[in-house]
Amino acid sequence: MEWTVWEGSWRRDGQGPGEFREVIQIGIIKLTDTADMEETEDIQILIRPVLNPELSEYFINLTGITQSQVDEQGLPMPEALATMQTFLKPGMPTIYSNGVDGNILDENCQKIGIPFPFAPDKFADIHSNLDDFLNVHPRDLVSSRLPETMGFSPPGHAHDAIADCRCIAEALRIMRRAGSF
């Protein structure tokens, strides 16, 4: 998942004036629950921000997502969440992320006054699994850096939601082969 950021906001943990972490891009891939964790489907959703409608130059340079893409292709958050729910289907198991994506989505829903459509336990943060496996501080476990940290080829552009999902998936595969996931 990608959300609004500004120069220096990482160091400020997104707590600077006007720096609400508004979700702009959601990527989801489905994996088989087998030894090889094969990818079966994917979806990427652009979201039109409400609170921070103008993307920062820093965000654009970091993600490659342009203002015109968001303006023309971005969905309102309620529609994006409905698309996400349809893709996940009822009964879909846990959503793994490298961080607190579920919390950030919930914060976004609260901030714009819409219901969060997922159970609190739907999202699982793999930070602690990666930290235990790699013995790396969680702050250094950015999804787009996993290829370098774990020794695999990047599956796409850094800070692209689908590419980050594929980084997480490959990290999980490596951990599974090592008997750690």
Predicted regions and their residues:
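Short acidic, Gly/Ser-rich segments with clustered Asp/Glu that frequently serve as metal-coordination loops
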Residues: 1-10, 14
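Short consensus segments that form the blades of beta-propeller domains
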Residues: 14-20
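Alpha-helix initiation/capping motif
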Residues: 17, 70-73, 136, 158
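Metal-dependent phosphoesterase core characteristic of DEDDh/y 3'-5' exonuclease domains
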Residues: 21-63, 85-181
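Metal-dependent phosphoesterase signature
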Residues: 60-80
